[in-house]
Each structure stands twice: as C-alpha cells, then as structure tokens.
C-alpha cells in the first residue's frame, strides 16, 4: 500500500454510508455523542487526522519552503529574459538579495496557515478532553501527544520565520502581546519533552499506520533541532527560565551553560537512534522517489496526491500540491519528460552553491559539459522587423555551431545514463538534437546565472532530487515531501558534539558511514572517493559540516536556519547576491494584514502586536 491518505470526508462516512433501502425503514439508532464515538480508536484516528491538512501549504513557493529556500544560498529565482519571466515586481529578487520588506503574500501565507493548523490542533484537543472519560488512558495520552507535537511543529515553522508569535495551548479567543523568541522556544521544548514519551514508536509492524503522522521519533528530532538552534534563536541559560522549570525532564540536563543546549540535542538524537525505528537508505534517491513511502529514512513527510482533481486548493497563488519539479525545470523538459504540466522555468541553484559539489557526488550536477555556443546578444525590446532580422542572425551565426555542439555533448543532460541531484546540460529531443526554446535558443541549462535581474532562460542548475514523473501520470508531484529525515538526526548529533555537547560520536557507525559513501555510489571505491572529495567532512571540521549539510539537505527547509546558526546568512562571500546584511533580517517582518487586525490594549491605546525590530510598523 503506497500511502495512508487522510481524508476529512471519512468522518462523514461514519454516519452517511447507508443504502436507500435502509433509509426507508424506520429504525432508531439513537443519537451518537462525541463521547461514544471517541470510545473507538479508529474514530480518534480520523478526528486527529484532520489536523494535518494545513501541512500541505508548507512546501509551496508562496509559503514556508519558498522563503526558507530563496533567502539561503541553495536557491535563486532570477528575472528571466526575454519576457521578464518571474519579475513579479522584483518580489523574488528581494528575497534572493535579502532586501525584502513587509509586502509579499508568502509572509502572510506562512502566518495564516501555520496559525490555522495550530488552532485546529487546539480545537481537537478540546474535543478529546471532553471525551476523555470514554477513552482508554493510553489512547488518550497518545493522541493528545500527537496533536500537541503537531501543534508544536506548526508553531515551530511560524517561530522560525518571525520569532515573536501568538503562542497558545488552548482553544480560546485571547489576545496578548506576542511572545518573545526565548519564551516561545521554552514552551515548545516543554511541550515536546512532555509529550514525546507518550508518542507512538515506529516499528516495521506499525510503520504504514503511522506514515505521514508525527511520532516519537519526530518529536525527539524536532526537539533536537530546537536545542541545536537555541543560541541562533536568541536563547541563553539566563532567559529560558520556563524550560528549566519542570518535573518531566527525564534525563535531560538543566541548562546552566551554552554547552548544555548541545548536550540535550545529543540526548534527543540518541533517543531517535536507539529506538531502532529508522535507518539510512542504500540509495539516496530512494527518499525522493515518486513512491517514496517505503523509505525507512524519512521520519515525517507530507503525503501527496499528484492528481490535480484530488483535493486541489488555492490560497491566492499558493497551492496545497507539491510543485517543486514544475517550478525548477526548463520549459523544454515537458516534451522530453512527458510532463502533464509545462514547467515554469523559475527556481534554480545559486552558482556558488553548486561549487560545493564534487563532480563524482550523485547529489550534485555530475560532470559539467563543455561550454555551449553563445547566441547573439538580444535587445530587450524589438519591433517585428527587428525580431525577424535577429532570427536570421541566429540561423546564420548560432544554429550551425549549436548542431555541431550537440554532437560533442551526447550523454550529458537528458541523455545522462546516471541520476544526479541537479540538472545541467542540454535538453535533447528523441533524435539527439538540442531542443530550441520559443526564442530559437538552445535549451542548455548551465550553472552560471547572468544576473538576478536579467538572467537567461537557460541559466542555473535545476533541482532533480525529487524523481520526475516521466510517464505523464500526474499533474503535480506524487512524491511525498520530506520534512524530517534520519540523516538530519545523525548530522545534528555530530554537530552538537562539536559545539560542546556531551556524548559519543556516531561517525564510525554503519549508518553514518553509509550516509557518506552512498553519495559516491557511481565510484568503484565510494569511501575513498568521498574522503578525497570532502576531506574536511571526514575529519569533522565544523565549517565543512555546513557545506555537507547543504549538499545533503538542499531544498528541504533547513538551509536558512543552518546559515543563521553558522553565522553565514548575510555573508555575501558565502551566499551569492546578498546585499542587505542587517542582523534583524534573521527574522522576517510580521505582515501588515496581521498587525492591522491586532486588538487594542485599552490601558495603553496601542495595538497588542508590534512589528519586529528593524521593519516599519503600521503608521
């Protein structure tokens, strides 16, 4: 069975599935109460399943994934010429160079959808509380834990973006000043530590039933992420009093020094590792296949359905469907890959990011083909007559060399016999000719990008870690989107130890070594190839771990926070195109539409909710 799909309509089926003949008979079934329905665990599963609906907004380019990726070194969306594709009033450009402001739907979308998910969790928790007496104690504890951990994840995504957020653990209409980052961090840590022991532990027997749901492994992995990033969130031993004041700490240490944050991160990782629920896949790409539900490395995913007619919803331009392959691939990929939806030729990798891959690393672009012939410079605007003359010039000066070039790059690009994490090179037709785009230019993706504001259609490497549907079955991506991987747990542990956390390194364990060597699977001796390619990783140099995390987790929603943690977020020598370097940009601006709705404090006459430091508040 490929996946467990959570369908809200299933709840209605409990009372609606009767035949016409049954309806004609006068039978009194009584009026089932919520309490009586909750006595059956399968009904609790359906009820709690509703809370996952808002996770599907997280991976859109108009949502969390978009801003997390575009503001880091792993992703860029340049304005493409001719036609000013993706200009959008330079919205994407401002994310790329860190000059964003409060305008832009993504910030509003992130706020609204994560809050919506958290509020629904609180509402369902209230429903469970009302029915507590009719439920088994262990069932109640497990599903309360599931909802509280999922709520923590919604809040975490909001917190990661804005820092100061309206954190509530009950279903009430209540307005208070936004909670400060260190307070939010403390509440999240408390909630996760309290609930993790009650969560389902994944085994081979229950893996399918827990697929796409938060589990104990996820709770501890998210907790590890909070501890590892505590200092980047502004937490200190002195300002997190709540996190040190509890009676359910288990074996976590009290935070008396910065090193204690990292010790607890190690402990969280060890809980995931020692549970034996997860393992590193032999094939890195197994985690991102069209059907990746068999992966034992993926801890938490968004369960997708690529059928455009199934549960397709929009919020403005944002959709609840996975559109990563459509976002990144060149327009010409559609005919070669038999894609239902024409790609949008937008998102790509920043050139500096691609330099961090060894050409033997399958997560990268692979061997770089020879440089393609350059087409004649094209004026930004032309009359019809000038365009006709330009096309004649292309035919005379460019198309001939392009045909000759095609003969020298057979086996590259779409003809590659090997799978790579990024696409560069020619897009060939079935006859081995390079496909011309609508401008009669060869579709040859390259690593280089001319500029943020005037890139070519073919500029930038395209992310292909998620398997592309080449059978034309799905309008959108059917691959389940990965939110947490076991590989991340292994790397978080090693980094936490290097930062001063107490614990025993797992670097030489079979899983960790497999995680490294599988990246060189095309080589005769993968271990030697990895050591030669990335010596700083093998010797566990902290700066090299940042590079390795980039290679391993590209476009998986972790890079922005990684850069902030390593002090590289505003480093223009490390992150291409960054021009704004203010410290306050480590948080995003709270949307005006949110601030405008803030209630007024009757004592002060001011709004309860204030803008983040550095950004313009509402006049």
Where are these predicted regions, by residue range?
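Bacterial Sec-type N-terminal signal peptides, specifically the leucine/valine-rich hydrophobic h-region
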Residues: 14-17
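Long, intrinsically disordered, low-complexity segments
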Residues: 19-20, 114-117, 249, 274, ...
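An aromatic- and glycine-enriched ligand-binding surface/loop that stacks and positions planar moieties
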Residues: 21-92, 165, 193, 213-220, ...
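Conserved, well-structured interaction surfaces
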Residues: 40-59, 63, 83-162, 172-211, ...
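C-terminal substrate/ligand-recognition segments
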Residues: 104, 108, 362-366, 370-515
């Amino acid at each position: 069975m490929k996946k467990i799909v959570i369908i809200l309509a299933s709840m209605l089926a409990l009372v609606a599935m009767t035949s016409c003949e049954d309806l004609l008979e006068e039978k009194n079934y009584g009026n089932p109460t919520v309490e009586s329905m909750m006595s059956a665990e399968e009904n609790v599963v359906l009820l709690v399943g509703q809370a996952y609906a808002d996770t599907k907004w997280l991976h859109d380019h108009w949502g969390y994934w978009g801003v997390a990726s575009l503001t880091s070194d792993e992703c860029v969306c340049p304005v493409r010429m001719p036609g000013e594709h993706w200009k959008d009033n330079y919205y994407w450009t401002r994310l790329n160079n860190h000059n964003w402001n409060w305008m832009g739907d993504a910030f509003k979308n992130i706020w609204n959808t994560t809050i919506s998910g958290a509020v629904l969790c609180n509402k369902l928790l209230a429903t469970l509380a009302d029915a507590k007496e009719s439920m088994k104690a262990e069932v109640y504890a497990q599903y309360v834990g599931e909802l509280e951990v999922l709520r923590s994840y919604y809040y975490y995504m909001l917190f990661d973006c804005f820092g100061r957020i309206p954190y509530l653990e009950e279903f009430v209409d209540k307005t208070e000043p936004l909670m400060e980052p260190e307070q939010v961090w403390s509440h999240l840590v408390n909630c996760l530590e309290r609930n993790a022991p009650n969560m389902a532990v994944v085994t081979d027997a229950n893996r399918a039933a827990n697929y796409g749901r938060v589990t104990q492994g996820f709770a501890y992995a998210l907790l590890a992420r909070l501890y590892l990033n505590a200092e980047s969130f502004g937490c200190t031993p002195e300002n997190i009093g709540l996190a040190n004041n509890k009676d359910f700490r288990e074996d976590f240490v009290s935070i008396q020094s910065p090193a204690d944050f990292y010790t607890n991160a190690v402990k969280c990782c060890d809980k995931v590792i020692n549970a034996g629920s997860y393992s590193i896949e032999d094939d890195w790409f197994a985690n991102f296949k069209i059907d990746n539900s068999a992966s034992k490395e993926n801890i938490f995913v968004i369960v997708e359905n690529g059928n455009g007619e199934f549960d397709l919803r929009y919020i403005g331009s944002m959709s609840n469907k996975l559109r990563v392959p459509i976002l990144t691939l060149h327009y010409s990929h559609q005919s070669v890959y038999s894609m239902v939806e024409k790609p949008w030729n937008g998102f790509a990798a920043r050139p500096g990011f691609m330099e961090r891959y060894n050409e033997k690393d399958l997560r990268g672009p692979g061997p770089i083909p020879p440089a393609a012939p350059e087409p004649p410079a094209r004026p930004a605007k032309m009359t019809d007559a000038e365009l006709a003359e330009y096309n004649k010039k292309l035919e005379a000066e460019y198309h001939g060399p392009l045909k000759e070039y095609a003969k020298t790059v057979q086996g590259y690009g779409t003809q590659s016999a090997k799978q790579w994490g990024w696409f560069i090179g020619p897009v060939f037709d079935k006859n081995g000719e390079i496909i011309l785009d609508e401008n009669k230019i060869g579709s040859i993706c390259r690593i280089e990008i001319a500029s943020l504001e005037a890139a070519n259609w073919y500029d930038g490497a395209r992310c292909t870690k998620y398997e592309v549907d080449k059978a034309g079955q799905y309008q959108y991506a059917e691959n389940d989107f990965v939110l947490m991987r076991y590989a991340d747990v292994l790397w978080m542990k090693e980094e936490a130890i290097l930062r001063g956390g107490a614990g025993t390194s797992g670097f030489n364990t079979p899983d960790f070594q497999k995680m490294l060597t599988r990246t060189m699977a095309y080589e005769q001796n993968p271990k030697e190839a990895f050591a030669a390619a990335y010596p700083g990783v093998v010797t566990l140099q902290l700066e090299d771990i940042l590079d390795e995390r980039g290679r391993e987790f590209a476009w998986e929603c972790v890079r922005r926070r990684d850069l902030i943690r390593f002090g590289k977020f505003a480093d223009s020598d490390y992150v291409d195109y960054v021009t704004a370097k203010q410290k306050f940009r480590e948080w995003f601006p709270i949307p005006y539409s949110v601030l405008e709705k803030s209630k007024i404090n009757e004592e002060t006459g001011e709004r309860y909710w204030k803008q983040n430091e550095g950004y313009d508040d509402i006049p």
